[in-house]
Amino acid sequence: MSDLHNESIFITGGGSGLGLALVERFIEKGAQVATLELSAAKVASLRQRFGEHILAVEGNVTCYADYQRAVDQILTRSGKLDCFIGNAGIWDHNASLVNTPAETLETGFHELFNVNVLGYLLGAKACAPALIASEGSMIFTLSNAAWYPGGGGPLYTASKHAATGLIRQLAYELAPKVRVNGVGPCGMASDLRGPQALGQSETSIMQSLTPEKIAAILPLQFFPQPADFTGPYVMLTSRRNNRALSGVMINADAGLAIRGIRHVAAGLDL
């Protein structure tokens, strides 16, 4: 039996991309999974696909009341909460400082930070009492932009750097009761959208980046799928496999940190 059997897991943005892959993985592990999802259509799809194995709540991660409503339903259903995974986010499609009008930069900043930073903070606030009671964990989705420039524009990159500070502070404030960590995936096949303020709410990340382009820049030379990144979340959630890690950010970048100056990777001819 999996050590995550009957663990109560709450994931935001579980309707597509990495969030959906996490929903699938934790259900496979026998966990009781809940998600807060903005799209009514995706909520309906989750309920149809997973039935009683998913508690899908329609709501906005920028609204504390929506979080609290979801947590109340989770506690009614499961009696506990073991892990909160803050995952819902938006990207800025590499919108640069120079090419973004000042008024758009301001509104885009507030929209993107509301989702990518405030959304995590509100989720942590709503989940903290239940996680303190269960001595559980929080995990936040970062990005390669939390370590490197060029993984987005200044808005997105700043939001992911802010999230690393949030992880460290929450890990400090909630220790020893709650472990708080992050996972930073690189580019992958997903439906990640951009801020409405930048005119990007209907534009998917895959309209800006091709599989070939992503694979070419990665030393491991493959185009990642969302399921490729679920392992670190499973490990960090597990009490058996992770008693010692808190305030840690796992950089799941397919080797970007060891990309060479002369070549992407030295073993391409092996």
Swiss-Prot record:
Keywords: Aromatic hydrocarbons catabolism, NAD, Oxidoreductase
Coiled coil: none
Record: residues binding substrate: S143
Tree of life domain: Bacteria
Disulfide links within the chain: none
GO terms under biological process: 3-phenylpropionate catabolic process
Catalytic activity of the protein: 3-(cis-5,6-dihydroxycyclohexa-1,3-dien-1-yl)propanoate + NAD(+) = 3-(2,3-dihydroxyphenyl)propanoate + NADH + H(+); (2E)-3-(cis-5,6-dihydroxycyclohexa-1,3-dien-1-yl)prop-2-enoate + NAD(+) = (2E)-3-(2,3-dihydroxyphenyl)prop-2-enoate + NADH + H(+)
Annotated positions binding NAD(+): 10-34
GO molecular function terms noted in the UniProt entry: 2,3-dihydroxy-2,3-dihydro-phenylpropionate dehydrogenase activity
Active-site residue numbers: Y156 (proton acceptor)
Pathway linked to the protein: Aromatic compound metabolism; 3-phenylpropanoate degradation
EC number: 1.3.1.87
PANTHER family: 3-PHENYLPROPIONATE-DIHYDRODIOL_CINNAMIC ACID-DIHYDRODIOL DEHYDROGENASE, DEHYDROGENASE/REDUCTASE (SDR FAMILY) MEMBER 4
Record function comment: Converts 3-phenylpropionate-dihydrodiol (PP-dihydrodiol) and cinnamic acid-dihydrodiol (CI-dihydrodiol) into 3-(2,3-dihydroxylphenyl)propanoic acid (DHPP) and 2,3-dihydroxicinnamic acid (DHCI), respectively.
Family: Belongs to the short-chain dehydrogenases/reductases (SDR) family.
Protein name: 3-phenylpropionate-dihydrodiol/cinnamic acid-dihydrodiol dehydrogenase
Lineage summary: Bacteria, Pseudomonadati, Pseudomonadota, Gammaproteobacteria, Enterobacterales
